[in-house]
Amino acid sequence: MIRHTRLLLASLCLIATGARASAEPVQDGQLWINTTLFGSVGDVAYFAEVQPRIGNGISQLDQIILRPAVGWKVNDALVLYQGYAYVEDHGMRDNVRIEDRSFQEINWKIGEFSGVKVSSRTRFEQRWQSAGRDVGFRLRENLRFAMPLPKDWGGVSAVGWTELFVALNDTDWGTRAGFDRVRAFIGLELPIGGKSTVEIGYLNQTARTQASGIELDHILSLNLFVRY
């Protein structure tokens, strides 16, 4: 009886340990490097972005994104875009997944409150992946805050933003409707001439993945924004 009780307790401990381990998120350290060119001709606005993402402990290319868009400046505070994104996902062990995205975007400079500039970016994506036939629909909402630091900092601003991703449907290539991921960034924005800036900081991403459940990424984010 005592032996059976010990075996039962040992089994329960193993089950509890396994459940706790499986519930813990997979973590990774990454480096994201982004270069985006912004410009306009009259009321026509455009941007083009290239972004390699290096993962697996900053040891190998995980993803690369090419993202151009053309838009219309409604006024100084509101711009509407139609764009396309080409995505190569190198995170799969066996092959490279290709994703094509069409997206519509609303950029809105909400205003300034107590010295803090607030802006919003809403993006609706239609996603096609090489691993399936279905079209995935995803909504993204980004809220950004920027506060200029004292003048002796030379025009540097403290920046923070958060972005929520929500999948709107299930697909045969793995997406499930509901929470997809959330990102939170904190860092500095440095002027480099004209309206161009460099943004550097820490980006945290919590994502729901098909393979591991929850993945937590700690990212060094380097961004060059060239504005004409």
UniProtKB/Swiss-Prot annotation:
Pfam families: DUF2490. InterPro entries: DUF2490 (IPR019619). It comes from the Bacteria. Keywords: Signal. Residues 1-23 form the signal peptide. This is Uncharacterized protein MexAM1_META1p0181.
